[in-house]
UniProtKB/Swiss-Prot annotation:
Protein name: Pentatricopeptide repeat-containing protein At5g18475
PPR repeat segments: 88-122, 123-158, 159-194, 195-229, 231-266, 267-301, 302-336, 337-371, 372-406, 407-441, 442-476, 477-506
Species whose genome carries this gene: Arabidopsis thaliana
Region called Disordered, residue ranges: 28-48
Family stated for the protein in its record: Belongs to the PPR family. P subfamily.
């Protein structure tokens, strides 16, 4: 199969994988007349060495290493030209995965069309992968189309796993009508009865929308079905929803019913729902009791359970208890993750102990736990809130030179602090650095900077900043305009007023 030209006919039929294919990702260009080959003294035998046969494994390996979609197609085509070679599920899967990741959707459609006439056995997982990618691109009709193609191309009835995957993607995207169509189709056309996983997705949907009563009705229907039964995931979802609606008493009762009446043992995920729920409600001591209950009943807490409790202590300002929990994690031999470290760092910074947070960052690096952008932003915010903007600027430069990935939020934290602390000269210089790196401040921040510059007697600089943002299409707020015009009029520099009017007109 070879993609040879640049225009694809969607209605064209291909009879076998030996026919030439049309590449939908090649755009038509005027073909240049090929240059004559350079003169060479090398013999024909030397210039045309025997090509090594590309096996399915080699084709898969080569395509996985190639990032460019056209390059992947070229490898796919080259393999198909070999005598006796027919592509299989593995090679098609890698090709389609690359194309859908690069949003070459026309190419994906063309290949799926060809697959209808292939004789090899395709696996359901190929279509599930396409569903996930189409869902990320908000192409929800295509998600349904991939589900329907399982029967057409793989020539098997979609499994309950396929229905669960498709339903979950549609529900998470808020596509209720498509979800309903899917369930009706599965019931009437495929004769499939919903399993626990499918029921759990429906429970999650109602909980997400705040319809807790409907969620309980789904659970009752699950019990009546005699086929599917609620599990720890079902109850965890319901309890999380109850906690979110400040119904902690009912959440605890449900937790007790799950154990005593249903005989379902809670797992670390269920316990985490309880810990997080109590922490959100400010009942951190009850959250700690849940952790103690876990240990007494042979369910060892994991990193996420400890992190949730630390976060709860931090929220109510109990930094010492958070530190004790942190030390307990280390004693158990568990390796704290980025979330755990960042949680405690944030606690230190909010308590005005940024130096302790920086020590913790050093410990984190020593333990080979990789800090993320949020971790660094916590430190920057801590330094800035303590009026240590110079150190924050130094850290920003140092981390940048070390290859640390910082986002626009990192820069905005420092600019906000400089404005709030009245360090206007530094703020203007830092604004220049940001613009050079293609990062723009938050709308409220640069408007505040303009106002502060004008109020502090730096009208000319304020005007330049305002005009600069106008030129890149950002619209100043009323306060900025008012501050600039008022300052100009006070200083009787009407030329600037006319410049502003010119900026508005243009």
């Amino acid at each position: 199969m070879r993609f040879t030209t640049s225009i694809i006919n969607e209605h064209r039929r291909f009879s076998s994988s030996s026919r030439s294919w049309v590449s939908p990702i090649c755009f038509s260009e005027k073909k240049k007349k090929p240059s004559p080959p350079p003169e060479s003294s090398i013999s024909p035998v030397e210039t045309n060495p025997k090509t090594k046969f590309i096996s399915h494994e080699s084709a898969v390996s080569l395509m996985k290493r190639e990032r460019d979609p056209q390059g992947v197609l070229d490898i796919f085509n080259k393999a198909s030209q070999q005598k006796g070679f027919n592509h299989n599920n593995a090679t098609y899967s890698v090709l389609l995965d690359n194309l859908v990741r690069h949003k070459k959707f026309l190419a994906v459609d063309a290949i799926l069309h060809q697959m209808k006439y292939e004789t090899c056995r395709f696996q359901e997982s190929l279509f599930l992968n396409l569903m996930r990618h189409f869902s990320r691109s908000d192409l929800h009709d295509k998600v349904m189309e991939m589900f329907n193609l399982i029967q057409v191309i793989a020539r098997v009835k979609p499994s309950l796993n396929a229905i669960s995957t498709c339903l979950n993607l549609l529900i998470d995207s808020g596509e209720v009508n498509l979800s309903r169509k899917l369930l009706l189709y599965a019931k009437h056309n495929l004769g499939l009865q919903p399993n626990t996983c499918i029921f759990n997705i429906l429970v999650k949907h109602h909980c997400k929308n705040g319809d807790i009563n409907f969620a309980f009705l789904v659970v009752e229907e699950m019990k009546r079905s005699g086929i599917s039964y609620p599990n720890s995931i079902t109850y965890s979802t319901l309890m999380d929803c109850l906690f979110a609606h400040s119904r902690s008493k009912e959440a605890v009762e449900l937790f007790e019913d799950m154990i005593s009446k249903e005989g379902i043992s809670p797992d670390p995920v269920t316990f985490n729902v309880m810990i997080n729920g109590f922490c959100r409600a400010g009942e951190v001591e009850r959250a700690k009791k849940i952790l103690d209950f876990m240990k007494k009943n042979g369910c060892n807490p994991n990193v996420y359970n400890y992190s949730a409790l630390m976060n709860g202590f931090c929220k109510v300002g109990k930094i010492q208890e958070a530190k004790q929990t942190f030390d307990e994690v280390k004693k158990t031999g568990l390796k704290l993750d980025t979330v755990g470290y960042t949680t405690l760092m944030n606690c230190f910074c909010r308590n005005g102990e940024t130096d302790e947070a920086m020590k913790l960052l050093g410990e984190m690096k020593a333990s080979r736990c990789r800090a993320d952008t949020l971790t660094y932003n916590v430190i920057l915010r801590g330094l800035s809130s303590e009026g240590r903007s110079e150190e924050a600027l130094q850290m920003l430069d140092q981390w940048g030179s070390e290859g640390v990935h910082l986002n626009k939020g990192s820069y905005r934290i420092i600019l906000n602090a400089l404005c709030c602390n009245g360090e206007l000269e530094k703020a203007v210089k830092f604004l220049s650095v940001m613009s050079e790196r293609g990062i723009w401040p938050h709308h409220a921040t640069w408007n505040e900077l303009v106002v502060r510059l004008c109020e502090s007697g730096y009208t000319e600089i304020g005007v330049r900043v305002l005009i600069g943002f106008l030129r890149i299409g950002l619209i100043p707020g009323p306060k900025s305009w008012g501050a600039v015009v008022e300052s100009i009029c006070k200083e009787r520099k009407l030329v600037h007023v006319f410049e502003l009017l010119d900026s508005l007109v243009s």
